[in-house]
Amino acid sequence: MTKNPKISLIGSGNIGGTLAHLISLKKLGDIVLFDVAEGVPQGKALDIMQAATIAGADIKIKGTNNYKDIEGSDAVIITAGLPRKPGMSRDDLISVNTKIMQDVAQNIKKYARNAFVIVITNPLDIMVYVMLKESGLPHNKVIGMAGVLDSSRFNLFLAEEFKVSVRNVNSIVLGGHGDAMVPLVRYSTISGVPIPDLIKMGLSSNKNIEKIIDRTRNGGGEIVALLKTGSAYYAPAASAIAMLESYLKDKRQILTCAAYLQGEYDVHDLYIGVPIIIGKEGVIKVIELQLTEEEKILFDKSVVGVKKLIDAIQ
């Protein structure tokens, strides 16, 4: 019998619990659900494992408060940290979540040095940078969940605008996972037809697309304002699963993620959202798109915003 991959989830809140459920339904591997809150990961693990029996998933799920249980993990997904509340930006979380991420990184360094690490905790681009520097893991094995989620929101709004299936929509959102993200209309298509061409055909307007871009940038904030007591978790979890699956199954999918750049896009020593190929080695390649002058200005503005936050924690 082939041994199941070991997947550790650091943080057992809404995203962590949803991740565990999705992993069990997809039968991607055995799960360790970690949290500092006693009883929470154990209770959720038991509940999800009972649900997994209905799905016919023969996997093990262990809830724990002990980091030693993540030892030998093939992949680790990190959601630990304070979530956003109404009126807060992702950046407002930086101080407390940096300390949490440093602690998580030290334990991954101790117990799971060979793992592929996906960071979800906000502010994303800064937290994944902290993870890399504190853990000492290779940069191709540490990425952040950003563009997959942002693109999924952009895809939904475009599908609604053009009244087509979301399966027909492909989009790319570059930059930091925040208000300065850069949805690339020129690289976004409906069944291969670029959005600017569809606008010329009279199927939409520049004004409507601009509204969609603004809504995409505020996609997380819109959900926070509606929930009032937390932030999005279904779509972030589904986005991380797409990244995890590409790694575990060596799918070599092109996904937009927060990746460590070393000169690509003229960016050095920084995590920023760009298209990458994910396979069994982790990040196989950064896809460097040719940007127009206007797109480059927006992208550079997003980079500057991330740099300022990095400087603030150093």
From Swiss-Prot:
InterPro entries to which the protein is assigned, alphabetical: L-lactate/malate_DH, Lactate/malate_DH_C, Lactate/malate_DH_N, Lactate_DH/Glyco_Ohase_4_C, Malate_DH_type3, NAD(P)-bd_dom_sf
Disulfide cross-links: none
One of the Pfam families matching this protein, by short name: Ldh_1_N
Enzyme Commission number(s) from the entry: 1.1.1.37
CDD domains: LDH-like_MDH
Reaction(s) the record says it catalyses: (S)-malate + NAD(+) = oxaloacetate + NADH + H(+)
Record: residues binding NAD(+): 11-16, 35, 97, 120-122
Active-site annotation: 177
Binding residues annotated for substrate, in chain numbering: 84, 90, 122, 153
Signal sequence interval, chain numbering: none
Broad class of enzyme this protein falls into: oxidoreductase
GO function terms (MF aspect): L-lactate dehydrogenase activity; L-malate dehydrogenase (NAD+) activity
Gene Ontology annotations of biological process type: lactate metabolic process; tricarboxylic acid cycle
Protein keywords: NAD, Oxidoreductase, Tricarboxylic acid cycle
PANTHER family, sorted: L-2-HYDROXYCARBOXYLATE DEHYDROGENASE (NAD(P)(+)), L-LACTATE DEHYDROGENASE
HAMAP family: Malate_dehydrog_3
Protein family: Belongs to the LDH/MDH superfamily. MDH type 3 family.
Reported function: Catalyzes the reversible oxidation of malate to oxaloacetate.
Protein's name in the database: Malate dehydrogenase
